[in-house]
C-alpha cells in the first residue's frame, strides 16, 4: 500500500520542486536585471479633472497639491466639477487656483454624468490636451506624478493608471 502512495506522491513532489526552482531562478534573475528608465522632457499637456460633490473640506488641499507638482504650469490646467454642491466646494476650489465649473442637474446624478459633462466642455475648448488625469477630491499626488505620466505617454502608452 505504501508503495502505491509513494508512486503517486513522489512524481507530484518532483513537479512542485521543478516549478518552485523555476520561479526562484526567475526571481533571482529579475533582482539583478537593471531597469532602464528614461526621463523625458515635459512636453505633454494635461487636463486634470476633479469631480467633487460637497467636498469643501478637502478640495482646496488637492488643488494646492496639484499646483505644486514638479511640472511646468503652462502644460496643465485643473478643472473642478462642483457637481450639485450645496456647500462652498466651488469657492474653495476657485480660491485655491482651479478652473471651477458648477453643474446642477437633479436627473443625471453622479460622478459618471459629471465627468462626461466636464469632458465635453474641455473637448470644446480652444486648447487641446494630450491626456486627461482624473482625481477624486480627497486625493493627494506625489510631486513627480505628472513627470511619470509624461514619461509613459512618451513611451507610447495610451492608457495609464497610477
Q: Where are these predicted regions, by residue range?
A:
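A conserved acidic beta->alpha catalytic loop
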Residues: 82-90, 105-107, 140
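N-terminal membrane-anchoring/stem segments of glycan-assembly enzymes
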Residues: 1-42
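Active-site beta-to-alpha loop of glycosyltransferases that engages the nucleotide-sugar donor
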Residues: 50-63, 84
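Short, acidic, metal-binding catalytic loop of nucleotide-sugar glycosyltransferases
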Residues: 64-75
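Acidic helix N-cap motif at the loop->helix transition within catalytic regions
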Residues: 60, 87-94, 102, 144
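Conserved donor NDP-sugar-binding/catalytic core segment of glycosyltransferases
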Residues: 143-162
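Cell-envelope/extracellular polymer assembly enzymes that use nucleotide-activated donors
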Residues: 44-47, 77
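Short beta-strand-to-loop acidic/aromatic patch adjacent to the donor-nucleotide binding site
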Residues: 125-140
Amino acid at each position: 500500500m505504501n508503495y502505491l502512495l509513494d508512486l503517486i506522491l513522489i512524481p507530484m513532489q518532483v513537479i512542485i520542486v521543478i516549478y518552485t526552482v523555476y520561479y526562484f531562478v526567475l526571481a533571482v534573475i529579475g533582482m539583478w536585471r537593471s531597469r532602464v528608465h528614461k526621463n523625458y522632457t515635459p512636453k505633454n499637456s494635461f487636463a486634470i479633472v476633479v469631480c467633487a460633490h460637497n467636498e469643501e473640506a478637502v478640495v482646496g488641499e488637492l488643488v494646492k497639491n496639484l499646483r505644486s507638482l514638479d511640472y511646468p504650469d503652462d502644460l496643465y490646467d485643473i478643472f473642478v466639477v462642483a457637481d450639485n454642491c450645496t456647500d462652498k466646494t466651488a469657492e474653495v476650489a476657485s480660491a485655491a487656483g482651479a478652473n471651477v465649473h458648477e453643474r446642477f442637474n437633479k436627473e443625471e446624478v453622479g460622478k459618471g454624468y459629471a465627468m462626461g459633462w466636464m469632458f465635453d466642455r474641455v473637448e470644446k475648448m480652444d486648447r487641446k490636451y494630450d491626456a486627461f488625469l482624473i482625481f477624486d477630491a480627497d486625493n493627494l499626488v506625489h510631486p513627480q506624478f505628472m513627470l511619470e505620466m509624461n514619461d509613459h505617454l512618451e513611451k507610447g502608452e495610451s492608457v495609464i493608471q497610477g
